[in-house]
Amino acid sequence: MQREYDYIIIGAGSAGNVLAARLTEDPGVTVLLLEAGGPDYRVDFRTQMPAALAFPLQGRRYNWAYETEPEPYMDNRRMECGRGKGLGGSSLINGMCYIRGNALDFDHWAKRPGLEDWSYRDVLPYFRKAETRDIGANDYHGGDGPVSVATPKNDNNVLFHAMVEAGVQAGYPRTGDLNGYQQEGFGPMDRTVTPRGRRASTARGYLDMAKPRDGLHIVTHATTDRILFAGKRAIGVHYLVGNSSEGIDAHARREVLVCAGAIASPQLLQRSGVGAPDLLRALDVQLVHDLPGVGQNLQDHLEVYIQYACTKPVSLYPALQWWNQPAIGAQWLFAGTGTGASNQFEAGGFIRTREEFDWPNIQYHFLPVAINYNGSNAVKEHGFQAHVGSMRTPSRGRVHAKSRDPRQHPSILFNYQSTDQDWQEFRDAIRITREIIAQPALDAYRGREISPSADCKTDAELDAFVRSRAETAYHPSCSCAMGTDAMAVVDGQGRVHGMEGLRVIDASIMPRIITGNLNATTIMIAEKIADRVRGRTPLPRSTADYYIAGDAPVRG
């Protein structure tokens, strides 16, 4: 087998597959793509049917199933930290919500030294490059990219429309496109689903395009043990295949690109000798480069479910009954339509809870059934719910490798809810959600409040609910942050500070978490840096306008 390549990419996920596809567009370029998981089996409904999104989180075939250390502000719970395993990475198991973040997230990044070319108008062309939206291209959306994006249709569940209307009746804006001119407000939510109703992972969109090329070599079930260095230059990787303890060395003529995600990328750097000296010493790892920010600055989104009974039989509750599922599956399999062809997150929104926030600090996902994200604790009656959570928590966590063993999970601590702002935002969010659900648009459907229940009212009671019931939104990020400060890990092109031939390109390099789901932005990051790796001129900046709230009230 060939053992030398131009580039070695570690992780065939949301970013790694983008890079594999783009780098091999250049004639003669060779790429080794290593993935610790297996293939994205197209016959497996668990990963291919949008409505089955909870199934991959319930096992370990497609999910690393990490757990945090006891979270000190969350009743010392060990909390889920699911990450994708297999071709497609987390795009193979995520909720398929196509949300890019707010324009001001990127303008905020661009205010940091060294990140001036990460403003919204700089990154928008790369969002467009990646996307094919089913209703066509415009100034904000692409029409010929590898990622299929589906828009909600008017004949979808009536509860989606009622919940959006309720948000507007409560005084918040209406927006027709959460990824367009104005994110703030309530409206339809796009999703990464193909026209045939299949999950649009990066394995389907990017790898299918790249697999026929002679320059791309993909190895699945390949766990990267460590990066190999000659001095400060990355020259290759040492990896294990399957359960074997016999390692294989592969060498990179140009660069090693780490795309293992916000948990595994810092863990791999630490095991390879790049990180904080005290940690590496404790692991008995030889120091290659002192970089204290590796694994620090870890951020995530936390959310709660506000659940209600539905007084009319219009929810998706019947779809949870086993006797209805064969027909749903058949319609999806043969026609690519019906309940199975949607992730059922087709409406949502973003609001500011207080005037002090310049752009939205709270996100909503509306769901026409009452159930946990991972498929557990389904309410045994017709119901609906709002997922609500804060977007830019001041809390910061960390990822630490526990040993040199590449198969041992790292120590993860998010420090969820460690600041007063965190608690205030969740109290506000729950109370505002109740106001929204109380609007006339939902009078025909609103039953009793199931969770947390109407008698949960005081600050102390709401805080107790959040401590015991809040869950991750599965958005870990920022643990190898871009920047030039002492705790930055990479520069604005993903190059690891103080090293040569080594980049990190995935959600870990976000300097600050964005306002929304992470998959679309992770793909954009990879598209943008791919041009840098290839030595190409960046795409021209967009001239599209975007909404800035300014002095506008949070409610009209």
Swiss-Prot record:
Family in the record: Belongs to the GMC oxidoreductase family.
Enzyme Commission code(s) on record: 1.1.99.1, 1.2.1.8
HAMAP family registered for this protein in UniProt: Choline_dehydrogen (MF_00750)
The entry's keywords: FAD, Flavoprotein, NAD, Oxidoreductase
Recorded catalytic activity of this chain's protein: choline + A = betaine aldehyde + AH2; betaine aldehyde + NAD(+) + H2O = glycine betaine + NADH + 2 H(+)
Catalytic class of the enzyme: oxidoreductase
Family annotation (Pfam families): GMC_oxred_C, GMC_oxred_N
GO term, biological process aspect, one: glycine betaine biosynthetic process from choline
GO molecular function: betaine-aldehyde dehydrogenase (NAD+) activity; choline dehydrogenase activity; flavin adenine dinucleotide binding
Active site residues per record: 475 (proton acceptor)
Pathway: Amine and polyamine biosynthesis; betaine biosynthesis via choline pathway; betaine aldehyde from choline (cytochrome c reductase route): step 1/1
Cellular component GO terms held in the UniProt record: membrane
Entry cofactors: FAD
Residues given in the record as FAD binding sites: 6-35
Biological source species: Xanthomonas axonopodis pv. citri (strain 306)
Protein name listed in UniProt: Oxygen-dependent choline dehydrogenase
Function per UniProt: Involved in the biosynthesis of the osmoprotectant glycine betaine. Catalyzes the oxidation of choline to betaine aldehyde and betaine aldehyde to glycine betaine at the same rate.
Keyword Flavoprotein belongs to the record: yes
